[in-house]
Amino acid sequence: MSEDNLGFVAINYISCTPEYQGRFEELFKSRAGAIDTLPGFRHMHVLKPQVPGEENLVISYWDTEEDFKAWTKSEAFIKGHKRGFEDVKKAKDAGQEPPMTSSFKTYEIITN
């Protein structure tokens, strides 16, 4: 990795209903781990807000943006998100609001 490319970070901002927060935490604590062996993956942190109702953060570190994008199109991505996607689908099929919503932003690391 060159000095010009210190890495890439994706931050997923996940809002959960109060009733779903515990389930969200359990999903990550018992995650499949499929991401751990993918090319370019460095590590991940899952952060719980100190203020109830604020967003959880899932911060993943990658060698390159291309590595991150390859993961989002992989079987490992589908496997790693299957249980959460099923929870959202179940709520929508029942005419309910989803128990969690998410959005993400990406960043280039400029200094260590």
Show the residue positions of the predicted features.
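An N-terminal domain-start capping segment
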Residues: 2-20
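Mobile, glycine- and charge-enriched loop segments
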Residues: 3-6, 25, 73-74
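A generic structural signal for ordered secondary structure
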Residues: 7, 35-38, 55
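Glycine-rich beta-strand-turn "strand-cap" elements at beta-sheet edges
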Residues: 1-6, 45-52, 82-112
